[in-house]
Curated annotation (Swiss-Prot):
GO terms for molecular function: 3'-tRNA processing endoribonuclease activity; ribonuclease P activity; tRNA binding. InterPro entries: Ribosomal_Su5_D2-typ_SF, Ribsml_uS5_D2-typ_fold_subgr, RNase_P, RNase_P_CS. Consists of a catalytic RNA component (M1 or rnpB) and a protein subunit. One of its GO terms (biological process) is tRNA 5'-leader removal. The lineage of its organism: Bacteria, Pseudomonadati, Bacteroidota, Bacteroidia, Bacteroidales. NCBIfam families: rnpA (TIGR00188). Pfam families: Ribonuclease_P (PF00825). Keywords: Endonuclease, Hydrolase, Nuclease, RNA-binding, tRNA processing. It is an enzyme of class 3 (hydrolase). The keyword Hydrolase applies. Belongs to the RnpA family. This is Ribonuclease P protein component. RNaseP catalyzes the removal of the 5'-leader sequence from pre-tRNA to produce the mature 5'-terminus. It can also cleave other RNA substrates such as 4.5S RNA. The protein component plays an auxiliary but essential role in vivo by binding to the 5'-leader sequence and broadening the substrate specificity of the ribozyme.
Length: 137
């Protein structure tokens, strides 16, 4: 039986180490669910949290920092509210995920659009989690 979802977003659930970020972008798989481009990597190396994430918004798309911060806040909030869609599967199969979300839209998206894209992307990643733990990575 899985525990009830926790809706916090702690530091252990954020991807911030340069080596881990390079590994995600170097070895990860990518897909687009508009307005998000998602790059993720699944692994069996033990971490504190089953999934860790980062959000990136290009300065080229949103020149003003206020808008970039708003979009990042929307993506983080959508992830925080829907991460249980992925974490339940990861916890059951003892797999760990690192995920990068990049905004590809040129216009400021609303929360409903971001949340739908987040749900679709987390369900898609959960569908790609292997049934047995990855032993040789």
């Amino acid at each position: 039986m899985t525990s009830p979802p926790t809706f916090g977003l702690s530091k252990s659930e954020r991807l911030y180490l340069r080596d881990e970020i390079n590994t995600v972008f170097g070895e990860g798989k990518a897909f687009v669910v508009y307005p998000l481009r998602v790059v993720y990597r699944l692994g069996s190396e033990h971490r504190v949290a089953y999934s860790s994430m980062l959000v990136s918004v290009a300065k080229k798309r949103f020149r003003r920092a206020v808008k970039r911060n708003r979009v990042k806040r929307l993506v983080r909030e959508a992830y925080r509210l829907n991460k249980h869609l992925l974490n339940d599967v990861l916890q059951e199969r003892q797999i760990y995920a690192t995920i990068a979300f990049m905004v590809v839209s040129d216009e400021l998206p609303d929360f409903r659009t971001v949340e739908r894209a987040m749900q679709k992307s987390l369900i898609r990643i959960a569908g790609n989690v292997p049934s047995s733990a990855l032993k040789n990575e």
